[in-house]
Structure formats: C-alpha cells, structure tokens
Amino acid sequence: MIDRLRGQLVEKDPEGVVVDCGGVGYRAAAPLSTLRALPAVGEECVVHTRMVVREDAMLLFGFATREEREAFDALTSVSKVGPRLALAVLSAMTPGQMMEAAARGDVHRFAAVPGLGRKTAERLVLELRGRELAAAGGGGGVAAGEGDGPFMEAREALTGLGYSLEEAERALRDVPPQETVEQYIKAALRKIGGRR
C-alpha cells in the first residue's frame, strides 16, 4: 500500500496531481482543497494517499493532510459513497465543516454537493454523526450539546418562526448548552433580540 508520496510536484490539474518520486510519476486524484494547498509545480511536496483496489483498476487518491485522508476514509465507509463522491464532498467543505454539518444534522449542506442526492446526504449525516476524526486531535469542532435533540429541535423551531438557518444557528452557538428545547429557544431569542 502507498501511504504517502514525497517528491517533486510535476503536474497539477482539476483531476489531481502527479508527484515524481525517484523518477516514477504517481498520479493521484485529489479534492480541490488539496490542489489549493499544494505548492507550485516544480516544488517538492508531500501527499498523503489512499489506494483503492478494484477488480479492473488500482486508484490512488491524494490529500494535503492526514485529516483530509481520514475524512475520505469516513466518507467511503458509508454505503453508496464511492471515492469520487467522497472527493466531491471534500472539494465542497473541509473535514471540520463536514463533521460539524453531520453533528448538526445539516442534510442540506451535504445535498448541495454536486452528484450527492438527498437520500445519500441523509445517510451521510446518520452515519457520520457522533464520529470524530483522530487526525484532528480529538477536537470535533462542535460544542457540547449542539449535535443532540434539543439543539436541533430549537434550530427547527427558530427557522419555523421565520429566522434564517444561519441566524438561528449563530444565536444557538452563542448559548451555553441547555437541558430543554424551550431553554434553547428563550436563550437564542434573547441573543437575537440583543443584536437588533
């Protein structure tokens, strides 16, 4: 298995990268975030990789960080999510944003990814919720209480009252963890009222 490549970056295009390691050029498909993070063509780079072996092909996928690679692994562990779809998700959001969206139950964020339908987005949220990426150093990026029922119900209630999803989430993030939906809503409304 090829775990990482270190060498000269000889090609970078929307499909991925080619890294020259000791005279051998390895092509790896990569998300847009990796393409942006890597240095210019001709410079030395390190690409963390994941090899996928299929009946008809051996595919190499490259990432700028181990956290991205771990997020790729988490995505491809979900039924109906293949490597290409996982790259599309990582091109649309960072691993931290991905895990936060899953913790919040934000199906719309996943469904906005090109090629990802609503049912697959729901499956991603269901299977990724509660997971942590070890490469992130244990920080899930979501404060305590945000991924649970009362927080989610309060968010839905606030959007039902006419507040935008962004405004509701911003207010709820500013509130310390609460026991009930009603407590979340009251505290969030005070925050929103204080901003106006």
From Swiss-Prot:
Top-level lineage group: Bacteria
Location of region: Flexible linker: 144-153
Domain I, as annotated region: 1-64
CDD domains (alphabetical): UBA_RuvA_C
Cell compartments where the protein resides: Cytoplasm
Keywords: Cytoplasm, DNA damage, DNA recombination, DNA repair, DNA-binding
Single GO MF annotation: ATP binding
Region called Domain III, residue ranges: 153-196
Gene Ontology cellular component annotations, sorted alphabetically: cytoplasm; Holliday junction helicase complex; Holliday junction resolvase complex
Start and end residues of each stretch annotated as Domain II: 65-143
GO biological process: DNA recombination; DNA repair
Subunit field text: Homotetramer. Forms an RuvA(8)-RuvB(12)-Holliday junction (HJ) complex. HJ DNA is sandwiched between 2 RuvA tetramers; dsDNA enters through RuvA and exits via RuvB. An RuvB hexamer assembles on each DNA strand where it exits the tetramer. Each RuvB hexamer is contacted by two RuvA subunits (via domain III) on 2 adjacent RuvB subunits; this complex drives branch migration. In the full resolvosome a probable DNA-RuvA(4)-RuvB(12)-RuvC(2) complex forms which resolves the HJ.
Family, as annotated: Belongs to the RuvA family.
Functional description taken from the UniProt entry: The RuvA-RuvB-RuvC complex processes Holliday junction (HJ) DNA during genetic recombination and DNA repair, while the RuvA-RuvB complex plays an important role in the rescue of blocked DNA replication forks via replication fork reversal (RFR). RuvA specifically binds to HJ cruciform DNA, conferring on it an open structure. The RuvB hexamer acts as an ATP-dependent pump, pulling dsDNA into and through the RuvAB complex. HJ branch migration allows RuvC to scan DNA until it finds its consensus sequence, where it cleaves and resolves the cruciform DNA.
NCBIfam families assigned: ruvA (TIGR00084)
Domain remark from Swiss-Prot or TrEMBL: Has three domains with a flexible linker between the domains II and III and assumes an 'L' shape. Domain III is highly mobile and contacts RuvB.
Protein known as: Holliday junction branch migration complex subunit RuvA
